[in-house]
């Protein structure tokens, strides 16, 4: 065995050994329990970042732990390869997105392999490959035929200069990110998935997910947003019907969760796109201008909370069905046309947003809820105004004195008797629009025919292949400019027709990739039925909390769609979910001449610390001049505070990177980058190597201790007790708790005790062998390369075949224990007694200690309290 720890030599050798043995290449095996471990697959952006390293190391630790415990472990890897960044990079570098993507995949795959992950690379999948998205298109056509996928108009951001649709994140302060042009809102036909048909099941099945973080489930519940309320129809006043047709000329419909406050409504507000708004604006330029302003604004619901609330009165009126009050209709920018009815009733006295709006525009506030003796002040909002639980109705005629639920039922009865409303359960969740007016995505398999309408592409003509030799120019959809792509024959009538040139939302690919991994080369369907039956759901899923809503919700939705198509036999895709924290690092900057910030990489900064080790100043190494310490933030390109994993691996080895990532913080918490922490991790691995080296230097490896320990010295018994207590703890830390930092700390403590123990002689050497073999197996999931190498030196066999160490229960039973002695609650000494010592023996031994004699000062004991196995407290 070489004396020095050299990761550059041992890591490739260990990886070759695993690859040659194909230990991570798995197939269905009914003789073993299965374990499907999956970390969210990466977008091939070019290089791995530290967040990737942390994410995939967590999955690898769990996979290797289960492998040693006899499970048939599948840990696949692939690439979430479609998306806008590839198009942006293509325009910047004048290269096709496909070429850019495939180059990145090759480089990142090399990086992943260098980290030694236990990945079954035979299952590798890239979502931009036709053999993958063919089946996505196939499912789309099936669901289109069933009506679960449908087409309707949707609002998009239109850049009039670049002549293209922009994503919300490409709109900056209302202008296109490339052209700088003011963005327009346009209605265009788009395809939608009826996720609302599954809203109730998606909500209820969250209760099945016992091993998901409660925070994630709460976020999904709020996103689905089930509410019980009432539809209310306000009759349109006779003098306000001009320009309106059909039901819009009869009534204005709203949905409210607070029908108990209906008597307090003082106006109603509609979206800019509402027919009543259009009718009112027909001859009013000021209304037309406001409507145009609203349509140019953001369509994102998230922006509604922070944006300034604006409105304009229409001069049109509707009638409150309960009290006959005539309420003016306002056009308001906070009402969204795509949500509900595009209209809301406003009760300023009991809704904070309405209160602020009414205050701004001097609209009336009518109190209809009272809570105790609290006085209503229309000049200042108070929290109790919106109290549903404790309020009772006032100023509401025969409804006065009713609580919320009683009032809800009474209002429902009144409205239903008039045909003016009824109770309704509603969801915040909206159908999922999947059309994207971009190039680098999965083509939507629809043909538009003037005779036959929208026709799904037949299965035998799939996939509709995306041309890969295209370099986008940012000026509209490339596919819409390619007759060779869009010109086709109608599958129904054979006449001239046109392919759909929109592509699918990239969340589509990530909504089912975990099923494709089960049989990635299966050519007769989305997933091989036998493989789907064996692997079932993912046992452990790992990814960031930022995916709590969209990706995880869509993946759950797709699982139910595929189940209903008979493709899989599970209701939920992920049994257990771990949401790892971010990797964060200090940030530094200098202000530039333009008032902006030039961010400086931490590696280029030199710090000065106070006597407590806290940074107090920083200078740039290159010029010695000060830089601003800006605090700790997530590693990112924009803040220039990232650390290249490849540099870390080159300097210290993959095992050091893995160990630091697992030891620096519990997996669900943020991990703060620390150069000293990395160096500390490397020191520990050198120590581990040195410990085994010194042991083998004293003689050849022996058979690890096993059997009765009656003949062992107390010191060796204590070491074995520590060893097996550590094994039990680490097993629990890996399996149930998933807290890897405490597992590492436990092994460090074990090695500390090993260093202090005399392991000379035949028995001592056998116990030493047992300790070192076990420590190496306990650490293999985290630092597999060094452990694989040390195991071969200690044992000569293959570590992955050795199995997880078992706990010797006999070793956990101590013949002697240490008990604290207190006098009047203060520690005055310790005694070593037999583990089964009686209460009387413990009392006698405690009273005889030097500390007890000294501090009792000759006084008799009033009481002696014995806590078995822990302490004796003498009260005088």
UniProtKB/Swiss-Prot annotation:
One cellular-component annotation, GO: cytosol
Keywords of the record: Aminoacyl-tRNA synthetase, ATP-binding, Cytoplasm, Ligase, Nucleotide-binding, Protein biosynthesis
Locus of motif 'KMSKS' region: 634-638
Disulfide pairings: none
GO biological process: leucyl-tRNA aminoacylation
Positions annotated to bind ATP: 637
Motif ('HIGH' region): 42-52
Major subcellular location class: cytoplasm
EC numbers for this chain: 6.1.1.4
GO molecular function, one term: ATP binding
Catalysis: reaction(s): tRNA(Leu) + L-leucine + ATP = L-leucyl-tRNA(Leu) + AMP + diphosphate
Subcellular location: Cytoplasm
Family statement: Belongs to the class-I aminoacyl-tRNA synthetase family.
UniProt xrefs under PANTHER family: LEUCINE--TRNA LIGASE, MITOCHONDRIAL (PTHR43740:SF2), LEUCYL-TRNA SYNTHETASE (PTHR43740)
Misc note: Present in outer membrane vesicle formulations which are used as vaccines in human.
Name by which UniProt lists this protein: Leucine--tRNA ligase
Lineage: Bacteria, Pseudomonadati, Pseudomonadota, Betaproteobacteria, Neisseriales
Gene (UniProt): leuS
